[in-house]
Amino acid sequence: MTTSVLRGRLVLEDTVVEDGIIEFDGATITRVCSVSDYEGEAPEASDATYLPGLVDVHCHGGGGESFPNAETAEAALVAVLEHRRHGTTSLVASCVTASAEVLRARAKTLAELAKADELAGIHFEGPFVSHERCGAQDPTYIVDPDADLTRTLIEDCQGYALSMTLAPEKPNAYGPGSVAEALIDGGAVPSWGHTDSNSVKAREALAYSRERFAQVETKRGPRATITHLFNG
């Protein structure tokens, strides 16, 4: 491998190094330190600033292409590369509320890119959301929570389904045999959004998620997430 070195201002997890070094072996970062701690030959000082890549967990597209409408992996890859050019290094592709047939097709297409390490995973925004708080989601395709459809979508994602936005107040969203159960058992995380829920339902949903996460082995964290703090 070829060693290369960058010099500039480094924004790290817990500090900023005003004059630092990033050393690479090929495409792998092998060292990050201040210039004063670097034993090798440092490049000329520069006014460049280097930051960690953005981890984007909710993205619908870019570069003239959208994940919800991408019928081929090649079309979806246009959006992936557009964000990568601008500093996003891990990207989760988000679908929107659509028919079951469309969602299944998109899941299979996006799973191809995830298998090729172009995407970090897949997020479904809907279709089990609130008509009252649908925002930009097409109300035509909003349906009641369906655990069987959820399991089918997870299977279509081939292990790359990360989360699904749903409204916790809807019937069969949470509890035994629910969408939340299917998500957690399938390695994905329930996420709230486009919801008209009250605090009682929300607390019940949180309690159920904690209980279910404790019962299964999963790569995900044991907490539900929130897609939107405002529903639209």
Where are these regions (language model features)?
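Active-site mouth loops of central-metabolism enzymes
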Residues: 61-74, 136-144, 168
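Divalent metal-dependent hydrolysis catalytic cores, especially in the metallo-beta-lactamase
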Residues: 60-62, 66, 77-106, 118-131, ...
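N-terminal metal-binding scaffold of metallo-dependent hydrolase/deaminase domains
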Residues: 1-38
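Divalent metal-coordination and catalytic microenvironments
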Residues: 8, 22, 27, 47, ...
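Flexible glycine-/small-residue-enriched beta->alpha junction loops
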Residues: 125-150
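Short amphipathic alpha-helices and their capping/turn segments at secondary-structure boundaries
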Residues: 38-48, 104-117, 203-220
